[in-house]
Amino acid sequence: MPRRTDLHRILVIGSGPILIGQAAEFDYAGTQACLALKEEGYEVILVNSNPATIMTDRDVADKVYIEPITLEFVSSILRRERPDAIVPTLGGQTGLNMATELAKSGIPDELGIELLGTKLSAIEKAEDRDLFKQLMDELGQPVPASEVVHTVDEAVKVGNTIGYPLIVRPAYTLGGTGGGMCCDEAELVRIVGKGLELSPVTECLIEQSIAGFKEIEYEMMRDGADNTMVVCTMENFDPVGVHTGDSIVFAPTQTLTDVEHEMLRDASIEIVRTLGIEGGCNVQLALDPNSFQYYVIEVNPRVSRSSALASKATGYPIAKIAAKIAVGLTLDEIRNPVTGTTWSMFEPMLDYVVAKIPRWPFDKFAQADRRLGTQMKATGEVMALGRTIEESLLKAVRSLEIGVDHLALREVADLPDDILEERLLHARDDRLFCLTEAIRRGRTVQELHEQTRIDVFFLDKVAHILEIEERLRACPDDSEALWIAKRNGFSDPAIARIWGETPDDVRVRRVDNGIVPVYKMVDTCAGEFESSTPYFYSTYEMENESKKSQRPSVLVLGSGPIRIGQGIEFDYATVHSVKAIQAAGYEAIIMNSNPETVSTDFSISDKLYFEPLTFEDVMNVIDLEQPDGVIVQFGGQTAINLAGPLSAAGVPILGTQVADLDRAEDREGFESLLAELGIPQAPGGTARSSEEAFAVAEELGYPVLVRPSYVIGGRAMAIVTSAEELKRYMRDAVHASPDKPVLVDRYLNGLECEVDAICDGTDVLIPGIMEHIERAGVHSGDSMAVYPPQRMSQQVADRIIEVTTKLARGLKTKGILNIQFVVANDPATGEETVYVIEANPRASRTVPFLSKVTGVSMAEVATRIILGETLADLGLRPGLLPFSKRIHVKSPVFSFSKLDLVDSHLGPEMKSTGEVMGSDDTVEKALYKVFEAANLHVPEYGKILITVTDDAKPEALQLARRFDRIGFQLVGTMGTARFFDEGGLRIDVAEKIGSGEAGSTESVLDLISRNGCDAVINVMGNGQDTIIDGKQIRREAIARGIPLFTSLDTAAAICRVMESRVFSTESI
């Protein structure tokens, strides 16, 4: 069928902020879809609340709305734009839920708007657990015994009928949110209670556990003419019981027989056809390893996390094809963009193995529950390609950027046998390393299979890696052993450790022996058809398929896996840098390891190398490509950390030079530069031992801010208020040493703000100044930022411009620079002073936001500067650009509901996973939008629980008066209530945790657990009891989905919004 000509304007719904379970893969999918629809001649309207995405750039859609994805705002856009159709299947769970909500509201029918792609009835059959079970029963497709429940009592009855263990799956939630495995009634009651609250339809499926079965995924594609195909098959390393987003995954499937594959393929095709899917669809199945019994676990009737992985694994652009199917085209009418010669109905063939490993946030959250189950916890993932499982697995391990380049983790190697056994029984993020260590200690593959239910085939591959280790030990300096190790994915540093040499020694030996990688093309057809895809992976074979271009080229290093502190913002900057490189006439080469991102779409760059971002792997590409230089400014700390080794190896680093990058990171060097330039900074010092840290803190006076150097996202940063706290920090959080110093600063309590600037070595452009709502002490990535500044005096703004210009020149910046300031009173003079907190001579996470609100594509301008142009050449004047008339607010978004035991209190260590943006004519309206977009819905009335420290009580009293004035009922613990009462404000009392007696006042936890309040304001204290109580309060509020504020500044911002939305009622 030809494309539909009765449609002209199409609305695409994005997926909103990055959350655990819904990450950058939807920016990749949405960008592909918008461009595909524009390619077909349609006018595309986009709504998304995430400014850090490529899809919200002005040139991706014809009209871009960065607005909350809520019924209120999407309805308003629909009424204003009157599109002919909506595509909801490219925005993840957010898009599907929005489509369902819109349909129930009747607005699409009222306006005559059609839902494109998979129909709403099919979405409901796949997403509604009861309807899905009924459909599978009708098809004769086996599903685990299950019942849908809407109350805890119903769940208990079902549990008694089906028997334990059970799996709880809440309806219409993301990444298994609220679900889990239950071994007894107590666990069932707890998990179902949470799941019902988090399900937007208050519904859970209670399902017979099939933990231990193989988990298989089929990524499917179907068009309106019923052409149905398998794009990719994937097999989880972990058996059923671990969420697929938290499992190591291989593509294609590795352990299925032809009979098993055909059986599951037929089942997937039948399901997709019966549902009437039009576009992409993911089918998850469980297979009994000892029989042909299988069960259908679930179907995702949309582009998903697995779709992005399948796209990058095969080269087949699923979202692009799905978008074209949505407007009527069929698979035999859509040309495969990879080969350019075949049609999209040909199923991709792989002559390589793909490995995906999740990237978890537990390096940031040491206190988190690291056990894996049916609720996803990973923030991102890496992918690696190789000719064997061993090669792709080891390449993926070193892509994780966790300080490990092989199957050896020191903390696991040091575990006692009993603890290691415990970790083998209960899957954790370090399971792969635990399995390896168990084999090292003499456990057999069969024993481990019986204990973990992981297939013997995969365990054999791990054992084979250890056999190669032993051969290397037995044959030091043997070129044949070296060749075998490299073919199976061993890194130079791993081999060097085994041989007792340096990585350089190994590198020289293998190059001298002709042991160098070749690069193979990803072409979707295993070489069967001619292809010229510029998408490559390395392996150790004979024929090289990547040829050096004759044009001058530049290599851009990506930012690797998404994790807290280094998210999609850096991929945004990478993509824009590539655009500028191409516009300047160079060939742009990208190297990255993240399958979720736009940067690893092979159509973005002239060449894509899907490789680990390590010195060895980067040098291998440089040896082949001989680029004119490497750009490291847009790949976050990942790329910055590679600048020094690459420069030492003679590689030209373009832009700001390594010595100046180091000077910004090195505390003493940076201090001396600021002193030389006459720029104030917080008094502080550098400690290379615990004793030095105590001495510096004693001299400065508490509180102090302590942090390691060379980190991103405020990792291991803390505000310390006493010597006892500092002792605990030095013991638990960091290990100070001469080469890893700890920085100790006086904590300055004031207004925090930041700038992103571009410098050509002489002139400095400052697109904008951002002002934080939360005062200093909350990490900038966790603070709400406002542009233009609202509380800043002109004198302070002028001083910031002056300091930024001085510092950019002082650091000899060529490219981009981020500087963070705190405006506070000088302790000695009492004068308002602008202090520099830190300077980062690289792109920051605010670049996408500031680029969008100022209209300056900062990464593109900075790249042109890096390549040798000046601001004057580009027609840009130095100094601060005029402020916009509209107010723009950027707000962090958190995933605490997915991370049990992680404290939601905000401080100097970053915890947010994503961001949203709101723009309007007033601050109050912009704030309202970001609160709605962040799912912190602003109530019009209700009860607010306030529990704060003694030093925060005076400020909290003033805030409480404002809430009281607009009609909110207030409740607090005894101490807070007494203080408020003395200040003339009566509030209800809730007992502190553990102090209530039978018949006494309700406790704080009871109040929260019965949803007896509509918001919680909890400011943490330093006493041990207060810390424990505060954690329990915050954890319960998160579990109940109650808006939680741990900063009075954020609470004051939401109060300001509420005040703007109500009429005052005062007696005369």
From Swiss-Prot:
Cofactor binding annotation: Binds 4 Mg(2+) or Mn(2+) ions per subunit.
Region (Oligomerization domain): 402-546
A biological process term (GO) from this entry: L-arginine biosynthetic process
Coiled-coil spans in chain: none
Residue span, MGS-like domain: 936-1068
Cofactor: Mg(2+); Mn(2+)
Sorted UniProt keywords: Amino-acid biosynthesis, Arginine biosynthesis, ATP-binding, Ligase, Magnesium, Manganese, Metal-binding, Nucleotide-binding, Pyrimidine biosynthesis, Repeat
EC number, as in UniProt: 6.3.4.16, 6.3.5.5
PROSITE patterns reported in the protein's UniProt record: ATP_GRASP, CPSASE_1, CPSASE_2, MGS
Region Carboxyphosphate synthetic domain: start-end pairs: 1-401
Binding-site residues, Mn(2+) 3: 820, 838
Positions annotated to bind Mn(2+) 2: 298, 300
UniProt protein name: Carbamoyl phosphate synthase large chain
Lineage: Bacteria, Bacillati, Actinomycetota, Actinomycetes, Propionibacteriales
Gene (name only): carB
